[in-house]
């Protein structure tokens, strides 16, 4: 599943798999904010990490719960990278999403539930909680997420 966005997160490309899983047509998503598929149970903390990494020109991995047009959902393991022009300027973002490791979803659901509760006291509380979660695992955010994907 693939999509591309501009610098502001508006969809400029979505492949057929993206459209099929999300239940939209190209006309319904083109030039719309990518958060058209964001499920309300996704913590803002995860997207803060995502945007912070990408603005620094770094790739990021994330488990994302997406919402379909008919209000169902599906989980993906996303890899998001900045798109760079010939002058090394970030001109947009490219996301490739794969099937997530099913055994990781329960861990992620629990973490995301905790993050959502923490965010009720402010986004900084969610960020602090995620930093501590990574620290306790002795991994960077990307290492943690990737290790969950690789776990048996």
Which residue ranges define each predicted feature?
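PAS-family sensory modules
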Residues: 1-6, 96-152
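Sensory/regulatory domains in signal-transduction proteins
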Residues: 1-115
């Amino acid at each position: 599943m693939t999509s591309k966005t501009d610098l502001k997160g508006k969809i400029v490309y979505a492949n057929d798999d993206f459209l099929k899983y999300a239940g939209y047509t190209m006309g319904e998503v083109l030039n719309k904010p990518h958060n058209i598929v964001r499920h309300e149970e996704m913590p803002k903390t995860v997207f803060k990490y995502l945007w912070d990494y990408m603005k620094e020109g770094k790739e990021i991995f994330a488990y994302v719960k997406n919402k379909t047009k008919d209000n169902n959902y599906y989980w993906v393991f996303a890899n998001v990278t900045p798109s760079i022009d010939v002058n090394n300027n970030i001109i947009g973002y490219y996301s490739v999403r794969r099937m997530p490791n099913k055994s990781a979803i329960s861990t992620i659901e629990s973490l995301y539930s905790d993050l959502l509760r923490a965010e009720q006291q402010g986004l900084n509380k969610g960020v602090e909680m995620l930093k501590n979660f990574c620290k306790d695992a002795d991994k960077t955010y990307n290492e943690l997420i990737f290790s969950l994907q690789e776990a048996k």
